[in-house]
Amino acid sequence: MRSDIIKEGPERAPNRSLLKATGVTDSEMKKPFIAVVNSWNDIIPGHMHLNKLAEAVKAGIRNAGGVPFEFHTVGVCDGIAMGHEGMKYSLPSREIIEDTIELMVKAHQFDGMVLIPSCDKIVPGHLMAAGRLDIPAIVVTGGPMLPGYVDDNYRDLISVSEGVGAYSAGKISETEFKRLENLSCAGAGSCAGMFTANTMACMTEALGLSLPGCATAHAVDAKKILIAKESGERIVELVKENLTPRKIVTQKSFENAIMVDMAVGGSTNTTLHLPALAHEFGLGLPLEAFDELSRKTPHLISLRPGGPNFILHFDRAGGVEAVMQRLASKLHLDQLTVNGKTIGENLDELEIVNPKLNAEIITTLENPIHAEGGIAVLKGSLAPDGSVVKQAAVDPKMHVYTGPAKVYDCEEDAMKSILAGDVKPGDIVVIRYEGPKGGPGMREMLAATAALGGRGLLESVALVTDGRFSGGTRGPCIGHVSPEASDGGPIALVKDGDLIEINIPERALNLKISEEELKQRKASFVPPKTEITGYLARYQRAVHSANTGGIVD
């Protein structure tokens, strides 16, 4: 066992003495040492229950003959960090999480690990650590939040975010606004739609790194506790089998995950996280792969924010495996999963307990919601290296659109303008200097997009940015524009009134000015100076472009 290096032989007596100080017995020294990597904290709804999941995991480890040791990672709530300086720290936390797991696991020579993440950057951070370390590992994602129920409708965090715009426009009363605030977020779990956290949980299951059913089992559901305990038991077997993440996850696994992503209308943040994850697995995953697979994979289930269904409905309809069952003819069914079975073998054992709901909300390949998948990659003179849009959540009349630019150099300025009523139907809002380097940190523009949505403008106004979006964003919102403004990309050269062409079917995003004019603007471009200190300064120096996954070397 790997852990023998800290507990075997006379020279390790000091090590054993310290371990015994924590309560480890001589008989336990002979057992596998399992890290329980928990991102629990009590400021994030998606994490507030993870201590209970950790206890179930540890019970499972003990049942199977292992010795659990729990430690914690940081976790940022994108919802609480939204709309202010705090959002600059969200994406950079991904690498901090990965690095801290590496430090703890390498320093203490664990034999295996159970990873317990939840929420947007925490799940990819844990997954990236699994790929980098390549010791036996299994992931227990924290589970979705139940939707709230307000004014006879299911609600979620995006209901509140869009309520800000609706309230500022006088469309809802203060009483209605307060009801949304008080009742939309129902308790523990990651936000209730197919936003980034739940998308990444689905990616984890599709990649084969969590047990079947884990992604959509809700935070407060007994299923989640059972899966946690079973995962604790399974990790001990994984150690004995020496079945590591790199033996499970292959290039074909990533193709499977992207096809699931397209079928469920997942968050555009997968175009950041999956390439970064592939990098840690020693694999390549170019941005173009998402578009290639999107063209081949139909959109099969309409989930929030682009549709009416919540993860609650998705789970009851069969969850990730039910979608994979629909996609079976396209998937690589021979890919291994963490339970030791292939995807095909797991699907053979799938029981659909609510067949009527399954048939109602998960469509077929022959009769999909959309013929193409949820995400499209656009390129052109405004985004030579690419940009992304959740096409499944865009009104069809905005798929081909040209309009004048309204340019802002940060989200705050755009937000003030939107709430003041300065943005009119027909405009294209451009928010720049929000990329990985320019922010730094590549903030999400949810406050701005939700304000547009709340004011009823997402059927007549587009937003283009080198920043990114919440998984809860809907409408013609194009992000990850690369190269970013801070690197002198064309988005830095846009002026108020310039015409911008969006053509999603043709995958085009163009700035409608002459090449000569673009060259003249480029020649006089001087990037703004930033005064950044601390971790963000180091991040700004090391981070790569969004089209590479925003990896940090």
From Swiss-Prot:
Any Gene Ontology CC annotation: cytosol
EC number: 4.2.1.9
Reactions it catalyzes: (2R)-2,3-dihydroxy-3-methylbutanoate = 3-methyl-2-oxobutanoate + H2O; (2R,3R)-2,3-dihydroxy-3-methylpentanoate = (S)-3-methyl-2-oxopentanoate + H2O
Keyword Hydrolase: no
Residue numbers of N6-carboxylysine PTMs: 121
Positions with a binding annotation for [2Fe-2S] cluster: 119, 191
Top-level division of the source organism's lineage: Archaea
Gene Ontology MF: a single term: 2 iron, 2 sulfur cluster binding
Record GO biological process: isoleucine biosynthetic process; L-valine biosynthetic process
UniProt: Mg(2+) binding residues: 78, 120-121, 444
Keywords: 2Fe-2S, Amino-acid biosynthesis, Branched-chain amino acid biosynthesis, Iron, Iron-sulfur, Lyase, Magnesium, Metal-binding
Active site, per annotation: 470
Functional pathway: Amino-acid biosynthesis; L-isoleucine biosynthesis; L-isoleucine from 2-oxobutanoate: step 3/4; Amino-acid biosynthesis; L-valine biosynthesis; L-valine from pyruvate: step 3/4
Cofactor annotation comment: Binds 1 [2Fe-2S] cluster per subunit. This cluster acts as a Lewis acid cofactor.
Signal peptide boundaries: none
First-level EC class: lyase
Record InterPro entries: Dihydro-acid_dehy_C, DihydroxyA_deHydtase, DiOHA_6PGluconate_deHydtase_CS, ILV_EDD_C, ILV_EDD_N, IlvD/EDD_N
Cofactor(s) needed: [2Fe-2S] cluster; Mg(2+)
Family listed: Belongs to the IlvD/Edd family.
Subunit structure, interactors included: Homodimer.
Function, as annotated: Functions in the biosynthesis of branched-chain amino acids. Catalyzes the dehydration of (2R,3R)-2,3-dihydroxy-3-methylpentanoate (2,3-dihydroxy-3-methylvalerate) into 2-oxo-3-methylpentanoate (2-oxo-3-methylvalerate) and of (2R)-2,3-dihydroxy-3-methylbutanoate (2,3-dihydroxyisovalerate) into 2-oxo-3-methylbutanoate (2-oxoisovalerate), the penultimate precursor to L-isoleucine and L-valine, respectively.
Protein name: Dihydroxy-acid dehydratase 2
